[in-house]
Design a protein with these regions (language model features):
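Glycine-centric low-complexity repeats
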Residues: 1-321
């Protein structure tokens, strides 16, 4: 490699070796499974109302995928409280509390809703057909890392049951179940490493006159394969609503299940190694009367299903980068 040089290269037989293959990318890590919501507490005739269950609590990379709290049972004659919505992308809505009244039977609280599962991460980009040069060395065209999937939303908390306020008979409603948390997303797979290339002559910011040479290049190395994205964690079930003395007092609804986390995206395949007779950046190259025998360009690295395969390396006699 010639840097900031003025040179004439003539009448030589130049033979370059083969490029080295790229490393394979790492596999992503699986997402954590969701946390189950807790059950609602019982209400009772001639007694107090039950508390709603707590939603499953889970943080994924600093963001909540927790389930919503279940609604408390209603005091005598009053409706149960509504359940809380879950947290996260597209969370499940909370259930409506059951109506209270002066006579039985009383309706149960509404179940909490379950959200959609988290989306999968986007695959990493393909390694290019050529990387570059830095400090006298070829820099490989690596594939990109797959993106993190989307966490699952938390399930909605269920509504609490209504309370009874009949003549000479009262009772508190049952608590609704808490929503299950969503699962955390899987992380993306690492990109495959770009392969080494084979170059006859390389000039950077140089003035070169290249005539009458025989220039043979070797084969470019094969790009490394992209790693697999990992699956997301499973969403957890919601807690059960209490049913004590139902339907004289309202039963609590069941908490919604959390959504599963999305899988991480696959890593992109590394770029195959180029095979180039004369490569230059900046400066000027005057080339004539040279004979070239180029090796095979390296194939791009594979990528798991849904990913981006690396590009085949560049194969050309003279290339300005």
């Amino acid at each position: 490699m010639l840097t900031s040089s003025v040179a004439t290269i003539s009448g030589n037989h130049i033979i370059a070796g083969n490029g080295v293959g790229g490393r394979n990318g790492f596999d992503g890590g699986p997402g954590q499974n969701g946390v189950t919501g807790s059950n609602g507490q019982p209400g009772q005739l001639s007694g107090p109302s039950g508390l709603g269950g707590v939603g499953g609590v889970l943080m994924c990379f600093g963001s909540s995928a927790s389930g919503g709290a279940g609604g408390d049972g209603g005091d005598p004659g009053l409706a149960g409280q509504d359940g809380g919505s879950g947290f996260g992308p597209t969370p499940g809505a909370g259930g409506v509390g059951g109506a209270g009244g002066v006579s039985s039977p009383l309706p149960p609280g509404q179940d909490g809703a379950s959200p959609l599962n988290g989306g999968s991460g986007v695959g990493g980009f393909s390694g290019a057909d050529f990387g570059g040069f830095s400090f006298g060395r070829y820099t490989t065209a690596d594939g990109g890392t797959g993106q993190l999937g989307q966490r699952g939303g938390g399930g909605g908390g269920a509504g609490g049951g209504g309370g009874l306020n009949a003549f000479l008979l009262t009772g508190g409603g049952n608590g609704g179940g808490g929503g299950g948390s969503g699962g955390c997303a899987g992380t993306g797979g690492g990109g495959g490493g770009g392969a080494g290339g084979s170059f006859g002559i390389v000039g950077v910011a140089s003035t070169l006159t290249i005539t009458g040479n025989t220039i043979e290049t070797g084969n470019g190395g094969a790009g490394g394969a992209g790693g697999s994205g990992a699956p997301g964690g499973a969403g957890a079930t919601g807690g059960l609503g209490a049913t004590n003395d139902a339907p004289q007092v309202g039963a609590g609804g069941n908490g919604g299940a959390g959504g599963s986390g999305g899988a991480g995206g696959p890593g992109g395949g590394g770029g195959g190694g180029p095979t180039i007779g004369i490569a230059f950046h900046g400066g000027t190259v005057t080339e004539s009367g040279n004979s070239f025998a180029l090796g095979a360009a390296g194939v791009g690295g594979a990528s798991p299903q849904g990913g981006n395969v690396g590009n085949t390396g560049r194969r050309t006699t003279v290339f300005s980068f």
